[in-house]
Amino acid sequence: MKWLHASFWVPYEGTEYPTVSKAQAAISAYCQKNGHTCRFLGDDQVEIDGVLHEIYRGYEPGSRGSYGIKCRKLP
């Protein structure tokens, strides 16, 4: 699949800062639900459909202090 966006937010319903394991579980669930393959290359990197992404875990802008998980395509 060709990625149209350089980054995307992964659904995360937790109220606490997402740990590495929570982030990886959320990304795995997102990929499975949307028909993508994923392979984790470390705590902060994931390969989705053969495209390398950086994993951001932190505040989601505009969410009134909620935490989020963002995958950003790496060059």
Predicted regions and their residues:
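Terminal, regulation- and interaction-focused segments at domain boundaries
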Residues: 1-25, 29, 33
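Compositionally biased, intrinsically disordered low-complexity regions enriched
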Residues: 12-13, 42, 69-73
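Sterically constrained small-residue positions within well-ordered secondary structures
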Residues: 29, 39, 60-62
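Short, well-structured beta-strand/strand-turn elements
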Residues: 36-42
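Short linear loop/turn motifs
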Residues: 43-49
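Long, continuous compositionally biased terminal/linker segments
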Residues: 49-75
